[in-house]
Each structure stands twice: as C-alpha cells, then as structure tokens.
Amino acid sequence: MKYINKILSLFVIALIATSCDPDAESYTLGELEDGNQGICFAGNYTQTVEVEPGITSFDLTLTRALTDAAGTVDVTVINNEKNIFVCPSTVSFAAGEKTAKLTVEAPSAAEGITYNLQLALSGNDVSNYSSGYHEISVNFAILKWESIGTGYYLDGTVSNFFKVDPSVPMAVEIEKTTTATSTRFRFDSPFAKVATAQDEVGGFNGYPFNAEADIVPGEYTFVIDVTKEGASLKPVQYGMDWGYGMFSGGSVYGNLSTNINSYPLGVYNEKAGSITFPANSLYVSMADYQDGGAYPCTNPSYLYLSAEAYLNSLETE
C-alpha cells in the first residue's frame, strides 16, 4: 500500500506571457478608412514554426478590426525559399469572424533544415492604420531527432506524495534535436511501464514501484528544453495512476510562476552530461487529488545522458 508522505500547500499561479520582435517595424493604430476591415497578420513580424516529423503544414492567423461583413484579402509570396511552400492566394472571413487561418503546405521540406517564407497582404480591406503587420517572415523547420543512446532518469517528484526512493535510476532511450532557440531532449515516460529488469549499471526498464494496474495505456513523452536561461521540463502526463488520478508534472517556472528565484530552472552541465532540476524546480500533480493541484517538489530530479555520466555521478557523491 502506498501512503501519502507530504502534502504541500496548494500553489497555482497563472502565467500570462507576451513577446515581441524588437527589430520589426511597429504600426500605429489610427482610424481606419471608411469601410476598411483592417485585415492583418496576428503576432510578430518574424515568426518561428517548428514541427515534429510527419507534419508538413502549419497555420498562420489573420485578424481584422471590423467583423460585421464577410471579407477577403489577397496573399502575395515575397520569398519562397527553395520553392518549398504552397500558399493560397486569398484568405476569406465569414461575416462575424474575427480571425481566419491561412494554411501553408510544405510537402517536400526536409528534416533539420530551416526554410524562410515571406508573405504580404493586399486589397481594399488592408489598411496602414491597422494594429498588426501586413507582411510576415516565417522560419519553418521540421525537427530532426537523433538518438544519443541510453540515459538514466532519477525522479524526485513522486516522492513528494509517496514514500518511494527518489534515487532509483530508470533507463531511458534519449533523443536530441536542435531548435532555433534551444537544445531539446526527449524520452518515453518510464512511469508508463512496470519494471521487469535492471541493466548493468542498475537502471530499471520501468518504474519499480508500479504494478500493472497502475499503468494508464497511451504514449507519454518527457521533453526537456535547454536554453540560455536553463533547462525546462514541458508539462507531461506520466501514464501512471496510483488511485488519485493521472500523475503529471513539469517545470514550475514558465508554467505556474514567473518567479525564477523561488522556482529555478534546471541546470544543464554539458561536460558532465547531466541535467539537474533542483528543489522547487519541478511540480507534480495527481488529477483527482485536491482538484489536480500542482505542488512544487522538494526533492531534486536528474537526467544523465549516458551510463558514463550516471556512474561518474555516483563517484562524486
């Protein structure tokens, strides 16, 4: 039987973040010409679109100020790098619609290469006094994931609720990719498996405290982004339920809080081949416990990118 070990006070802070392109020209909102709908692109002038392998299209959003009547805008391609992109020549709004989607296809794009697309809007419903951009530059890439072999994940989140050993290593197969702003690692959730064996360095091939009834069928992937700020675990479902609903977790900073001093990001040590999430860096939640409240974790979590890195960490303890 599993017993709840700690219950922290509930912590939920909504994060609202906005970003802008400091190099892009800004428009000053003025009075639109009579009858002009003020159609423009939503978002920044320069946008980055990164998709997973197998995805060969993406959507851009157009918006407008006047929505009473239907409207149409012309789309002109200014730059189509290597003729990768297929774009519609017009985008239409139905009466009452505030936004519309422009779907761009890139059927021949190769993985790991960034392609640039520049578009411009024109027509009677485009105004110099609208609030957004009439032109847009999009850098599009299909991520290229490469295996870097077996690593070891030591979890400090589940022990926030239950009396389990946070130093148990779980063997995970790690993939790596490089994005426009980060180095990214991913691996299948070890919690969605029952451990049946250990490898030569002691890593379990699943979570050793699981029974078959604890597993929630599905695909669950841990994704860690490393930027100049630090390492961040994207919100993830574990694929495990110990009677209080699905476990989930992620980084506190950027998801629940903007206070990086109280809730630090993880530390990527490239030389040591490790990522350390210190105390209060990650949160954990169970869907049916306290309305799914998210709790910062007092125990650290570690990802070692190789067996050598994990064994070296044992020698330095």
What are these regions (language model features)?
Residues 4, 21-159, 312-317:
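Acidic/polar, low-complexity intrinsically disordered N-terminal segments immediately downstream
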Residues 143-317:
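Ser/Thr/Gly/Pro-rich, low-complexity flexible regions
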Residues 16-19:
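C-terminal motif of bacterial Sec signal peptides marking the signal peptidase cleavage site
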Residues 1-8:
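Bacterial N-terminal signal peptides that target proteins for export
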